[in-house]
């Protein structure tokens, strides 16, 4: 069934959208959702292995957090070559030296040129101690100029397509922080398995970095309205990131409500960074007891974020890649 943009423009409509094929892990009680049409079931809560994981500083504490997450039913681990200049991947590689790989491993590749991208992929595999990752994303698609670099004959898109053909990556995709229109264009043009976008109560993706006033911004030009419908229509895996907007949304709603907002969208998983063990425990409890927010709540929460705050968050992410 195709999904029109109009039918899911509002958060209320999104909240009512059923997650087809959703289930629960019988051993852990963790909710599982299909990653698009890949045939893979992933935990609705994913472990973000970016700056919030690296905040543990002590590798042993970081391993403890990862181990707790995995034993509690989280099976999607989200890393990137740029996180700590490879430190995130290296920590995961250290974990895998003494643990069986029983989770879905994701990394992201940044360079736009083919040669540099291939070198980074080689380094990532070495960091993990693996010959294959489950999902390889093009990291942080930007504006039109960046799109042209990605799609160039000697660009990164060709490289990750080759990685899938060579079984270095089981699946491929792209992430985007601030450019819903560009992301929608890219998703529409290419046959990808997955995409990750910034989804939170601020409904960001509306303001250009130069938009200092932040006037007239609405969710109608954000990721939910512009890019999400394309991913859903193509039955791609869809993951939410920046659920807390780097903690900028804390205070607008309780942490568990922010997680529930993301999980109430038609996503495969909400990727959350958890810099303390108690945060891991709290978010696991939220996921296992998850009930969707009501249509009214899904409308009220974005309305609580001012246009100025939304613009500020947009500008922040326009210049920021979690590292």
Question: What do these predicted ranges mean?
Answer:
Residues 78-95:
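Glycine-rich, proline-tolerant flexible connector loops at the mouths of alpha/beta enzymes
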């Amino acid at each position: 069934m195709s999904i029109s943009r109009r039918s899911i423009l509002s958060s209320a409509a999104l909240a009512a959208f059923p997650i087809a094929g959703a289930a629960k892990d019988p051993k852990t009680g963790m909710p599982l959702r299909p990653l698009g049409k890949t045939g893979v079931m992933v935990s609705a809560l994913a472990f973000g292995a970016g700056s919030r994981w690296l905040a543990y500083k002590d590798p042993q504490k970081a391993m403890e957090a990862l181990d707790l997450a995995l034993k509690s039913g989280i099976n999607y681990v989200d890393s990137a070559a740029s996180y700590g200049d490879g430190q995130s991947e290296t920590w995961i590689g250290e974990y895998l030296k003494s643990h069986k790989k029983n989770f879905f491993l994701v990394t992201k590749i940044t360079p736009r040129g083919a040669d540099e991208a291939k070198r980074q992929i080689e380094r990532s595999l070495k960091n993990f101690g693996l010959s294959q990752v489950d999902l390889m994303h093009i990291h942080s698609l930007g504006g039109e100029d960046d799109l042209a670099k990605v799609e160039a004959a000697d660009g990164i898109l060709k490289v990750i397509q080759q990685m899938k053909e060579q079984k270095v990556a089981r699946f491929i995709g792209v992430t985007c922080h601030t450019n819903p229109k560009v992301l929608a264009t890219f998703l529409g043009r290419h046959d990808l398995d997955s995409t990750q976008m910034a989804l939170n109560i601020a409904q960001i993706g509306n303001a250009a970095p130069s938009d200092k006033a932040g006037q007239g911004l609405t969710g109608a030009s954000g990721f939910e309205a512009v890019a999400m419908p394309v991913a859903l229509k193509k039955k791609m895996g869809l993951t939410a990131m920046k659920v807390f907007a780097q903690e900028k949304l804390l205070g607008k709603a309780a942490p568990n409500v922010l997680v529930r907002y993301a999980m109430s969208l038609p996503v495969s998983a909400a990727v959350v960074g958890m810099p303390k063990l108690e945060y891991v425990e709290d978010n696991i409890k939220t996921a296992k007891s998850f009930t969707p927010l009501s249509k009214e709540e899904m409308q009220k929460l974005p309305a609580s974020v001012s246009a100025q705050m939304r613009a500020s968050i947009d500008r922040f992410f326009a210049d920021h890649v979690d590292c």
